Amino acid sequence: MGLFELNLAIILFIIGNFIGLEYSYRKYSSPYVEKGIDKFALAISVFGGILINSPLYMLGCLLIGFPLGMRPGYGRVEFVVGLAVALFLYFLRW
């Protein structure tokens, strides 16, 4: 992995954060909710965790950044699940 690819992955992660923030502001009107898991964000995060361990890791960075960028109170569980999937697959491959 070269420096260009790493920088592109970081930029895509940040773009994923912005997309997640925009999504959460459009979907949720209340500022903070502790209950409930967003199924769409969970699916995006798990799929991103799978793609991080493949040649499409840049797209995985975009997708796993999506739930991390959501409003406070949203996306925490989804991000942790996606990160756990990514780490599990990394150690399984290692």
UniProtKB/Swiss-Prot annotation:
Q: Which residues cross the membrane?
A: 1-21, 46-66, 72-92
Report the principal subcellular site: membrane
Highest taxon, organism lineage: Archaea
Q: Name one Pfam family in it.
A: EhaL
Q: Name one GO cellular component term.
A: plasma membrane
Location comes to: Cell membrane
Q: List the disulfide bonds.
A: none
Instruction: Give the way it sits in the membrane.
Output: Multi-pass membrane protein
Keyword terms of this UniProt record:
Cell membrane, Membrane, Transmembrane, Transmembrane helix
Q: What is this protein called?
A: Uncharacterized protein MJ0518
Instruction: Name the source organism.
Output: Methanocaldococcus jannaschii (strain ATCC 43067 / DSM 2661 / JAL-1 / JCM 10045 / NBRC 100440)
